[in-house]
Amino acid sequence: MSPLESGGQSGWLASWKGEAVNWECDELGHLNMRHYVGKAEEARQFLFIHLGLAHAYRAGAPSTVRTRELTVCYLREARPGARLAIRSGVTRLGEVDADVVHVMEHAPDAHGNVRVAATVEERVEHIALRTQAAFAWPQRLRKAVRIVDAGGIGARGLPGIDAFGPDRDAVIAMGADRVGAGVFRASEADAFGHIRPTSLFGRCSESVGHFRKGFPETHAAGGLSGHGAAARVSGVLLEMRLVRHAPAAPGRAFEVWSGLLEARAATRNLVHHIVDPVSGASFASMVATSGVMDLERRRLVKSTPDALERLRRNVLPGLTA
């Protein structure tokens, strides 16, 4: 039985059930970060449909529920074929916004024990699509919501810095490195033409491997393209908070810029910015806690004192999100 079920909290909803499909897993051999977020996105939609907003995610709807901030905490790997389930609940209901939490769990083992794979916390807004402004929740939803207690759930290692979305020039002035670029595709958008958070996570995921200053040990070892002992370590994401600043749409160009905020022996904090290279505006900013994983032992590797000293030389004192 799930720990949440055993607490007798009826506000939790079984909002998604499936598995980690092989093609969703990356070169590290586990579910890629974007697909944790994608499954949580489905769970959030299922939750609000269940709460009475049946048309909120259909094309042509007058209003929707949109994620403004999202924090993911990875706790246990989901390897190919892993059976997973998500339960979701509302932890706070404001006038026009709400806080929602999703708990992704592995299927019970032979002894009935359930292990949490990840948690996703979202701050969402009720949006009128004609004006793109937040407006009050309907009474039917207010009557349907049962607030859940999510104490002890969520990220713990992220720095408490504000994310205000500096523009491209400001990001460059901070000393961040350009690690990714491309153009958003139609397949990355929701029913209303906005690029989904799962794609923003994914674009960051496929770019951060170029961030040599954040992961010098994996570059020195040859990364995953190396051979033998050199290919046994790789950077891994542990927690990340994303804040959306301006809507991104298909056909819009983007760049990913990254910087090192702080470094410790076992983990390091990074800041990523996804910006429009044409207007300079910020689409989103992300603060992450990452580490280096031994791919054979499947656990984090601590930096030696000398390696940590070298890594800390790459910290950007004025870096913000």
Task: Please place each PLM-identified region on the residue numbering.
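HotDog/MaoC-like acyl-thioester-processing domains
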Residues: 2-16, 73-83, 87-167, 244, ...
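Hydrophobic pocket/interface hotspot
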Residues: 29, 88, 132, 192-194, ...
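Short alpha-helical elements of helix-turn-helix
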Residues: 34, 72, 242
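An N-terminal domain-cap segment
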Residues: 55-78
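Structured core of small recognition/catalytic domains
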Residues: 180-284
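Catalytic strand-loop segment that frames the active site of acyl-thioester-processing enzymes
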Residues: 1-46, 50, 155-220
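A short, polar/charged loop/turn motif at coil->beta-strand junctions and beta-hairpin connectors
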Residues: 9-14, 61-66, 174-178, 231-236
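A short, amphipathic edge element
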Residues: 67-70, 85, 235-239
